[in-house]
Amino acid sequence: LCIVGENGSGKSTLVKGLLGLITPVRGCVRYGDGLKRTEIGYLPQRTDVQNDFPASVWEVVTSGCRGRGPFLTRGMRQTAQENMALMDIADIRDRSFMRLSGGQQQRALLARALCATRSLLLLDEPVAGLDPVVTRELYEVIAMLHRDRGLTVVMISHDVDAALRYADRILHMAHGATFLGTPDAYRLSPLGMSFAGGESRD
């Protein structure tokens, strides 16, 4: 699911509600399949990430395991190693996180999010500020996690073209209007035609 829409339409607020960081004004948040809030893998916006702390890549990645217990078990270490290998950062595990490129930092943070979950990833603008090549690589990695590992991915993005290319469902949040449906249906919707240049049918 890719969430798109105007600034201030509530996209990030929705994610914070799913994470339990804010309390809904009305209603409640329910998780299916026995999922616990602490078992959600979260990748925040890059502007929300502290880049100047002196932690190694290994320390950043393994911090994603902390929701499962206060101490790193052998299984947690193995999970962290596997996720670092999956993100192609195993060879830089001892490097300082703050010295990494933007793309490497996002891969490390995605590995951390994978350590926290086996089923649901919440990604808030995961490619913001990255160059086009790194952006495409990261989108392919995210698509692989959904396709090959069966992870449910909920991603906020301002990149409508990427949403149409990679998402199974699109949620468009706007002031006074919303859309939820397939990319093809979105292209034909009023919001889709406004934001994505869709074409109406006769």
What spans do the regions from the language model cover?
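H-loop (His-switch) and adjacent beta-strand-loop-beta switch element
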Residues: 170-183
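Conserved ABC transporter NBD signature motif
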Residues: 24-38
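Conserved ABC ATPase "signature" region
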Residues: 75-92
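Catalytic Walker B motif of ABC-type/P-loop ATPase nucleotide-binding domains
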Residues: 121-124
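H-loop/switch region of ABC-family ATPase nucleotide-binding domains
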Residues: 157-158
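Helix-to-loop junction immediately C-terminal to a conserved catalytic motif
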Residues: 19
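Conserved ABC ATPase signature
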Residues: 96-100, 104
